[in-house]
Regions:
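A structural preference for short, hydrophobic beta-strand core positions in alpha/beta folds
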Residues: 35-38, 147
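Cysteine-centered iron-sulfur cluster-binding motifs in ferredoxin-type domains/subunits
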Residues: 7-8, 12-17, 45-54, 77
């Protein structure tokens, strides 16, 4: 059982990663293997809309990890896509990554019927709009959406602030438990 967690932040160890680390603890306690994909530190190109991927199953842009992610996604059991909030939407980096990963995934077969969870981290507001943006990818790819005991969000400007958001951290733990449960149920048939 494996979940892939995508950190859509430019900061490898910022507030978004703080939220994911809280989830990872729960996944490990639930005996779910984790793999973190860090989008920070490298450029992510936007989709060229050339449609070559619809014939080849791969994006023509080969140097930013999207094709590698799609290959790994085919064997994953669930996904978490996490983002910092910029002006009430996910990071452009994450949007570019999702556009290309979902479109080039050959009819979305890498994601179909696999549960997904969106996570948004912000200093203050805009999280629900950001979550809506990510959840749209799940809907079009026929992915069940995992929820928690509150919206999947954490508040804080820096990692230590985010870790002090008790309700946000509890929401992340509950979200991880719910996603692990969904993956196990689907695997059991």
């Amino acid at each position: 059982m494996k979940v892939m967690l995508v950190n859509g932040s430019s900061h490898l160890h910022g507030t978004t990663m703080t939220a994911l680390e809280e989830m990872i603890k729960v996944f490990h306690s639930e005996e779910v293997e984790t793999e973190v994909v860090q989008l920070g530190g490298k450029p992510i190109a936007d989709c060229l809309q050339c449609n070559v991927c619809q014939k080849t199953g791969k994006c023509v842009i080969k140097d930013d990890g999207v094709n590698e992610f799609v290959e790994k996604a085919k064997t994953a059991d669930g996904f978490v896509f996490a983002t910092p909030v910029y002006f009430a939407h996910p990071s452009g980096r994450l949007y570019d990554f999702l556009d290309r990963a979902f479109y080039s995934a050959g009819g979305y077969d890498a994601f179909k019927f696999k549960p997904g969870a969106a996570v948004a981290v912000a200093r203050r507001g805009g999280t629900t709009a950001a979550l809506d943006g990510i959840n749209k990818y799940f809907g079009i790819a026929q992915m069940p959406v995992a929820g928690s005991t509150y919206w999947n969000m954490v508040h804080g400007l820096y990692g230590e602030e985010a870790s002090q958001d008790e309700e946000g951290m509890q929401t992340m733990r509950n979200l991880a438990r719910n996603l692990a449960w969904m993956m196990k149920c689907f695997a059991a048939g």
